[in-house]
Amino acid sequence: MPTINQLVRKGREEIRKKSSTPALQCCPQKRGVCVRVYTTTPKKPNSALRKIARVRLTNGIEVTSYIPGIGHNLQEHSVVLIRGGRVKDLPGVRYHIIRGTLDALGVADRKQGRSKYGTKRPK
């Protein structure tokens, strides 16, 4: 335990919170170009083919991001917007692609929760 004098000289060091999305560099979203679009399998109790993309951001960092929703039109060289948010059963996937912006089209035939998948209101 430090003495009063040691605290006066040095003081307590603040515990800094580690960012869960360091590649965004404190921005809410970042633009990037798809380098590779592929599927992968989730961790132990779950089973599926999850759609993910390797994205090179405008700041030069390359990240793995998840493509939400059913069906997508992304391929290599597609320009996408990514946001933070991890996928629990995919290790190393810390970002989501935002549907309905830039080259990522919204989910077709989506009726509920449309704003999250970039779908316009059906007529």
UniProtKB/Swiss-Prot annotation:
Primary role: With S4 and S5 plays an important role in translational accuracy.
Gene name of the record: rpsL
Family: Belongs to the universal ribosomal protein uS12 family.
GO molecular function terms attached to this record: rRNA binding; structural constituent of ribosome; tRNA binding
Protein name as catalogued: Small ribosomal subunit protein uS12
Signal peptide: none
Keyword check for RNA-binding: yes
GO terms, biological process: translation
Originating organism: Syntrophobacter fumaroxidans (strain DSM 10017 / MPOB)
Gene3D superfamilies per record: Nucleic acid-binding proteins
Subunit structure: Part of the 30S ribosomal subunit. Contacts proteins S8 and S17. May interact with IF1 in the 30S initiation complex.
InterPro entries assigned to the protein according to its UniProt record, in alphabetical order: NA-bd_OB-fold (IPR012340), Ribosomal_uS12 (IPR006032), Ribosomal_uS12_bac (IPR005679)
Family annotation (PANTHER family): 30S RIBOSOMAL PROTEIN S12 FAMILY MEMBER
Spans traversing the lipid bilayer: none
